[in-house]
UniProtKB/Swiss-Prot annotation:
Belongs to the glycosyl hydrolase 10 (cellulase F) family. GO terms for molecular function: endo-1,4-beta-xylanase activity. It comes from Caldicellulosiruptor sp. (strain Rt8B.4). InterPro entries: CenC_carb-bd, Galactose-bd-like_sf, GH10, GH10_AS, GH10_dom, Glycoside_hydrolase_SF. Residues 40-190, 193-342 form the CBM-cenC domain. Residues 1-34 form the signal peptide. The keyword DNA repair does not apply. One of its GO terms (biological process) is xylan catabolic process. Keywords: Carbohydrate metabolism, Glycosidase, Hydrolase, Polysaccharide degradation, Repeat, Signal, Xylan degradation. This is Endo-1,4-beta-xylanase A. The keyword Cell inner membrane does not apply. It comes from the Bacteria.
Amino acid sequence: MMRSLKSRKLVFILAMLFLINAIVSLKFITYSSANQLASKSKYIEYNFENKSVSPLAKYPSNVVLKVTNSTCAEGTFSVLVAGRKNANDGVIVDITKFLDFSREYEVSFYVLQTTKKLQRISVTLEILDSNDKNQVIAAEKVLLPNIWTKVSAKVQASNYKKAKRINLIVNMPTSKSDSFYIDLFTIKDLENAYVLKQENFENKNTGGFLPEDKNCKITLAKDRAYSSAYSLKVQPSQKTKNGKILFPIKGLLQKGGTYDFSLLVYQDSSKPVNFSAGIKLNDGKSTKEIVLAKQNVAPKKWTQLFATLDLDTRFSAKDVSFFVKPAAAISYYLDLYSISDENWGQPVPDYNLPSLCEKYKNYFKIGVAVPYRALTNPVDVEVIKRHFNSITPENEMKPESLQPYEGGFSFSIADEYVDFCKKDNISLRGHTLVWHQQTPSWFFTNPETGEKLTNSEKDKEILLDRLKKHIQTVVGRYKGKVYAWDVVNEAIDENQPDGYRRSDWYNILGPEYIEKAFIWAHEADPKAKLFYNDYSTEDPYKREFIYKLIKNLKAKGVPVHGVGLQCHISLDWPDVSEIEETVKLFSRIPGLEIHFTEIDISIAKNMTDDDAYNRYLLVQQAQKLKAIFDVLKKYRNVVTSVTFWGLKDDYSWLRGDMPLLSDKDYQPKFAFWSLIDPSVVPKE
């Protein structure tokens, strides 16, 4: 059922269909309806269409649970969780009887909150044995207002073989009294976790299907069913002849998602009848139907109708329903309706998230460093465009990438960054022109002897010529296209008496190369902003050396426009007060801009096998990042750009350190939410 992620188009693509006419041996997952449970079923669903709140129970007794048709993720009904008096109030579900203790399960449900602010939903496993009661947070999700959101928790049942009872507790700890809604509660083993919805009508209700025409009758039927006792019978009015039925699905759909719809159709007229299936959209002003599948259904044969829907990342509609419609005014039957998520198990971002760069548009640019592969990945591209208004090529503009051998400039990939930024109105930071790493050895090799250059005047001239040619060729090519350059990178070593790193650049040219680099870059593009960039700028000794370097260069009239503070840090170091001291120091240099160029916060060395403690570390990471941003906002007159060194954790140069805003699956961490709304980040 899985397939690789496809390019998202500007409008959502309505994709392929295939139909199987005479079905002889269809294979469906084992299914249990809500009131006919099998203890080891692979898929269990409660959709509340029977108007019962089961299996949800009050937690505690003051909570009010009510089935309502005022809103739903799918079908017709959901459960309102009201009467809350405490942040821990919510619902509890005893899931013990559903579990085979040799399997791993996904427990999921859809939740909606209608307050005017962000809220956090929490899912806790409560494990009770003969001696003890233990609670473990199984899932947490930040909810935007008025958007149905899927919340999933994995339960490794084999870890709890000695448990007498396992409860699932759902609450909204960011609010003591606000109500919320729950719909489509499912328990399924991981083999079937891609299934979002399945209806076989054995729950003795119409499963949330609705007739488009109020004169059309839909009822349960025992005279026709594919494999069990019941199916859904549709009888259009002979007056209106409208046999179209609808199934509301808006809450199930995620922007950028891919969904498979499958159902069985049976009709017993005297000839084949064409059936169509698709989606009906309502934007609040008008409706539109889009057919996903058409098929002739032969008489007296169950026929599978299958269609796939791809949603664009900008998809929006007030209401969405799946529809089935015969071309003739005949009675017909439906059975085994299902919706599957083709992207399950694959990383898919939440395209409803608030935009970071929009949040900070009145403070500074929000940037990200990305490798070239991100520009070729449509999912990465959408994330970049939503959250960032500045990008830095991670390695693609470093000397070894642009001039791997003398005179052999290679601009094709760097040009793609320029084209990408121009197309999407994103600013481009160039990184970096001069560095002691990722610079080809030929820069420092005598072209005649093959020996390493020395500090002789002749060799100095060779290296200066190479430096000038490289800078002016690169900066000149991107004149007016790169708004800021990290001209010189990491030239300071606080352990040296004079503070200069003993790199090949320094050993051959002395500190002169720094000054020359800025002058030549300015000549090539007088409007580009030129930065000195370095790490550990929070170290008092190092920042003092950098401060003196920049102040001296500016005193000589060298065109240095800003300092880049990399900010590769950890939970333990530095203290946020040192970051503020660094900003304060450089803000004393008149006209100097400050860019935070490579932010990440490593937590790896603190991590353990204890999930609760690791969650605590993620909270600490978020709180530290929030404190840093409080400082940066305070100095917004000089801090003009803030860049994160990576799009998500597995793209980071510190891959195992979980240092960025999103996890490997694009899911926002507490660090992200600390910059959007700190109130949803746990306090502990």
